Regions:
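Short alpha-helical "recognition helix" segments of helix-turn-helix
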Residues: 37-42
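Key DNA-contact positions within bacterial/archaeal DNA-binding proteins
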Residues: 47
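Short, Lys/Arg-enriched anionic-surface-contact patches
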Residues: 2-20
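Conserved tyrosine-mediated DNA breakage-rejoining catalytic core shared by Y-recombinases
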Residues: 53-54
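Short amphipathic alpha helix immediately N-terminal
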Residues: 17-31
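Short, Lys/Arg-enriched C-terminal cap helix and immediately downstream tail that follows
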Residues: 57-64
């Protein structure tokens, strides 16, 4: 099932408390930005971005 941008944004805003995590997830899911670029923007490592996305992936997908 295909989910739209608005649905992803709604779920992320509703379930993800951390501003940093919300920003990382939106850049990845909504904008398709690579881990390295997100890491540069947020001042964290690409591995941390990957961990954020992996940590929240199940929650986001369950609530779509």
């Amino acid at each position: 099932m295909e989910h739209g941008r608005d649905e992803y944004e709604r779920v992320i805003d509703l379930w993800v408390r951390s501003e940093r995590d919300r920003r990382a997830l939106k850049r990845k899911y909504l904008d398709g930005v690579c881990y390295e670029r997100i890491a540069e923007e947020l001042g964290i490592s690409p591995r941390t971005v990957q961990n954020i996305v992996n940590r929240w992936r199940g929650t986001v997908e369950r609530h779509l």
